[in-house]
């Protein structure tokens, strides 16, 4: 299955569904493939990403019906990393239960959540739950915790995308579906990840007038200083999806804060499992890096064979640094 980012407005959904149907006709391998779209719902509770459009329940209901007519699952993302404890107050519990009951009534297929208590509330309301990547599931112990809650799926922390041994161990010991982010290009083991998620969670829910995004700017700065950090980002190239088939069930395309034209480009590349050109154009990372760097996707052919057995002891290895010199060029 492919899980595709959706900016939230009805017109974008139509474009995504049309693109899926078009590719199904062209590519015979996709005729039996399953699809879902996921959309942020930042109202009050918040999400862990920037949000372009905030659909209301009436809008969501229309979109859910449209998606189902085209055999596309519809997932709503309510994955704030922090909601200030309001979900543990009587008023908060009542309000969240009301939200979940509304989502159930309009036919949403699943909700993506990162908080264990919200998972319990959602399941009590009859909703299927996908554990968000913001839950940072990067070990078997964490995966078992969520699997015991009988969730529909777990989205693995992208930091283990190239740790095939960990993914294999999780696959062999959980019964739920596993979902993996394919084009997220955050820093490997980013030390600012949870703080950045917290920032978005509060900014989306409370409309905080932030002066600037420190974490975003620092992310850019670090990768201009050390370009090998881009190579070390745990992205999965379209051509390398085949290495994950059998290990995971769902390939998640990140980027719901991007314009629909960008999303269409990424859909085409990953569904066709091929991209010739600048890989930066597919990666969900600061746009400034795309404009600054050219990452030759063909120069990365075969790199995954090394990454599959890499022990990630970077101080004793220069593979990514040497690959960056070969594949990654400054445009200007």
Curated annotation (Swiss-Prot):
A Pfam family: Peptidase_U32
GO biological process terms held by the UniProt record: biosynthetic process; proteolysis
Disulfide bond found in the keyword field: no
EC numbers, comma separated: 3.4.-.-
Group of enzyme by EC: hydrolase
Keyword Hydrolase: yes
Taxonomic superkingdom: Archaea
Database matches in InterPro entries: Peptidase_U32, RNA/ubiquinone_mod_enzymes
Gene Ontology terms, MF aspect: peptidase activity
Swiss-Prot/TrEMBL keywords: Hydrolase, Protease
Coiled-coil features, chain-numbered ranges: none
Similarity field: Belongs to the peptidase U32 family.
Record's protein name: Uncharacterized protease MJ1657
Organism this protein belongs to: Methanocaldococcus jannaschii (strain ATCC 43067 / DSM 2661 / JAL-1 / JCM 10045 / NBRC 100440) (Methanococcus jannaschii)
């Amino acid at each position: 299955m492919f899980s595709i980012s959706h900016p939230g407005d009805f017109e974008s959904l139509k474009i995504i569904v049309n693109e899926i149907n078009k590719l199904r006709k062209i590519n015979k391998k996709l005729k039996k493939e399953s699809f879902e779209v996921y959309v942020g719902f930042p109202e009050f509770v918040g999400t862990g990403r920037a949000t372009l459009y905030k659909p209301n329940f009436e809008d969501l209901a229309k979109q859910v019906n449209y998606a189902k007519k085209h055999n596309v699952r519809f997932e709503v993302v309510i994955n704030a990393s922090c909601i200030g404890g309001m979900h543990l107050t009587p008023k908060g519990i009542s309000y969240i239960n009301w939200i979940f009951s509304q989502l159930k009534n309009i036919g949403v297929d699943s909700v993506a959540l990162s908080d264990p208590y919200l998972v319990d509330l959602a399941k009590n309301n009859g909703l299927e739950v996908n554990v968000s990547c913001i839950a940072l599931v990067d070990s078997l112990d964490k995966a078992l915790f969520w699997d015991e809650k009988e969730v529909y799926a777990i989205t693995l922390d992208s930091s283990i995308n190239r740790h095939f041994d960990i993914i294999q161990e999780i696959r062999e010991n959980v019964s739920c579906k596993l979902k993996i982010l394919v084009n997220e290009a955050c820093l490997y083991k980013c030390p600012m990840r949870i703080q950045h998620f917290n920032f978005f969670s509060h900014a989306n829910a409370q409309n905080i007038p932030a002066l600037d995004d420190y974490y975003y700017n620092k992310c850019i700065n670090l990768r201009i200083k050390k370009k090998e950090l881009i190579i070390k980002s745990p992205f999965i190239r379209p051509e390398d999806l085949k290495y994950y088939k059998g290990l995971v069930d769902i390939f998640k395309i990140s980027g719901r804060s991007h314009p629909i034209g960008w999303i269409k480009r990424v859909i085409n590349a990953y569904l066709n499992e091929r991209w010739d050109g600048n890989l930066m154009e597919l990666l969900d990372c600061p746009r400034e890096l795309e404009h600054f760097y050219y990452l030759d996707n063909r120069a990365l052919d075969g790199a995954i064979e090394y990454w599959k057995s890499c022990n990630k002891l970077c101080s004793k290895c220069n593979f990514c640094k040497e690959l960056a010199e070969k594949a990654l060029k400054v445009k200007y």
